Swiss-Prot record:
It comes from Escherichia coli O6:H1 (strain CFT073 / ATCC 700928 / UPEC). The modification Phosphoserine is found at S150. It catalyses: L-seryl-[protein] + ATP = O-phospho-L-seryl-[protein] + ADP + H(+); L-threonyl-[protein] + ATP = O-phospho-L-threonyl-[protein] + ADP + H(+). This is Serine/threonine-protein kinase toxin HipA. The gene is hipA. Disruption phenotype: Deletion of the hipB-hipA operon has no effect on virulence in mouse infection; the disrupted strain is as virulent as wild-type. Toxic component of a type II toxin-antitoxin (TA) system. Phosphorylates Glu-tRNA-ligase (GltX, on 'Ser-239') in vivo. Phosphorylation of GltX prevents it from being charged, leading to an increase in uncharged tRNA(Glu). This induces amino acid starvation and the stringent response via RelA/SpoT and increased ppGpp levels, which inhibits replication, transcription, translation and cell wall synthesis, reducing growth and leading to multidrug resistance and persistence.
């Protein structure tokens, strides 16, 4: 039976096996179980001897891959993978994935040193960023057969290595430092069309605003190559060693992986975890008080900016030695306000991915949510009332200046339509905070 050897920073963690019936099993290596660095690959796959055969194995590895069936088909076509199954796809592109996981076929030897790369010219960078238009997955252009990466999510993206001011393609098992996200474009739905052609600017703006309001988010910059604009987001699951000679991978996983769930149920409405489940899980964090506070603060922020995609795969935890864990920075933040006014899109259609508690059931409609719903949610979760009021009061006090500061920091060619759409609606919802909380 074929096996994929699983590594974390050059330490053998275990083996992923695909059985004849297509089932996936995982077994931790004895040397990993005995190591002082030992930690579970996933909190849904506790350290243990013997084969793990639960559905969590398939789901964990499947969640390392792009969500889009189209992108998965491109991977099959590009590398002649045997199927769309996680084992077969990761056999081809598992050298650099989310967190610290590196997957290498047991019969394959990686000859490149730990850190090796090829510097990209601007023309070459543009080729990588536009590869999806030629049906090439994740920027893995045909001339670079040693460039094998996996990036989860639904958006067109790739991952690259930044060395100084240069963008580089990593070689062998060299990690990447940045996720590069392309404009989403138009999304056609049965009754509506979402114009997300300015998603790069949208996400950049939202990240700046989040940082201005004290939320922990990654650094990002807009990059240009030829006629392409993209968002380069610094990976928080990567860190240089003290000498800056080796780039380390930091173990992490998203909440679908944590709960052993497939990505198909990442939304609460589809059966995925909501605020209550994640807040209960964060009680076990090594920084429980901070993580629970930050998570609730981020729920308010998502409401204020009209962020509708805060599902389980967009929240993650670092996995530390021994199996302790803590919340990662927040990521994949985009406002739906700039798409309002498009074909069939109204503010009444915008819904939070995770519902708030209300007098009757859950409140998800952004335009129908008020501070009282956050207070009610906090009460149900036994989150301190004083902490919830502090969060709301801080937003009431900080929002106007934060909006001004972000606007003043933007480049001259930044699309005004994005700023105006987000600002106008944030201030409108901010008005619901002010009477009750601005003076507190």
């Amino acid at each position: 039976m074929p096996k994929l050897v699983t590594w974390m920073n050059n330490q053998r963690v275990g083996e992923l096996t695909k059985l004849a019936n297509g089932a996936h099993t995982f077994k931790y290596a004895p040397e990993w179980l005995a190591s002082r660095y030992a930690r579970p690959l996933s909190l849904s796959l506790p350290l243990q001897r013997g084969n793990i055969t639960s559905d969590a194995v398939f789901n964990f590895f499947d969640n390392l891959l792009p969500d889009s069936p189209i992108v998965r088909d491109r991977i099959v076509k590009r590398y002649h993978a045997k199927s769309r199954q996680p084992f077969d796809l990761l056999s081809e592109i598992g050298r650099d994935s989310v967190g610290a996981v590196t997957l290498i076929p047991e019969d394959e030897t990686v000859t490149c040193p730990i850190m090796a790369w090829e510097k990209l010219t601007e023309a070459r960078l543009e080729e990588v960023l536009t590869a999806y238009k030629a049906d090439i997955p994740l920027g893995m252009i045909r001339e670079e057969n040693d460039f094998r990466i996996s990036v989860a999510g639904a958006q067109e993206k790739t991952a690259l290595l930044r060395i100084g001011n240069d963008w580089c393609i990593p070689k062998g098992i060299t990690p990447t430092t940045h996720i590069i996200k392309l404009p989403i474009g138009e999304i056609r739905q049965p009754n509506a069309t979402l114009d997300l052609s300015q998603s790069v600017d949208n996400e950049y703006y939202c990240l700046l605003l989040a940082k201005e309001l004290g939320l922990n988010v990654p650094d990002a910059e807009i990059i240009k190559a030829g006629r392409v604009r993209a968002l380069a987001v610094k990976r928080f699951d990567r860190r240089w060693n003290t000498e800056r000679t080796v780039l380390l991978r930091l173990p992490q996983e998203d909440m679908c992986q944590t709960f052993g769930l497939p990505s198909s149920v990442k939304y609460e409405s589809d059966g995925g975890p909501g605020i209550a489940q994640i807040m209960a899980f964060l009680m076990g964090s090594s920084e429980a008080l901070k993580d629970r506070y930050d998570f609730m603060k981020f729920q308010v922020f998502q409401w204020l900016i009209g962020a509708t995609d805060g599902h389980a795969k967009n929240f993650s935890v670092f996995i530390q030695a021994g199996g302790s864990y803590r919340l990662t920075p927040f990521y994949d933040i985009i406002s739906a306000f700039p798409v309002l006014g498009g074909t069939g899109i109204h503010i009444s259609d915008l819904k939070l991915a995770m519902g708030l508690n209300a007098s009757k059931g859950k409140k998800t409609a952004i335009d129908k949510x008020y501070p009282r719903h956050f207070x009610a949610t906090a009460k149900v979760l036994k989150f301190p009332e004083v902490x919830m009021h502090e969060i709301l009061x801080d937003f009431a006090r900080m929002i106007p200046a934060a909006l001004d500061n972000v606007k003043n920091s933007l480049p001259x060619d930044f699309p005004e339509x994005v700023v105006t759409a987000v600002e106008t609606n944030v201030l409108r919802l901010h008005g619901r905070l002010s009477p009750e909380y601005x003076x507190k």
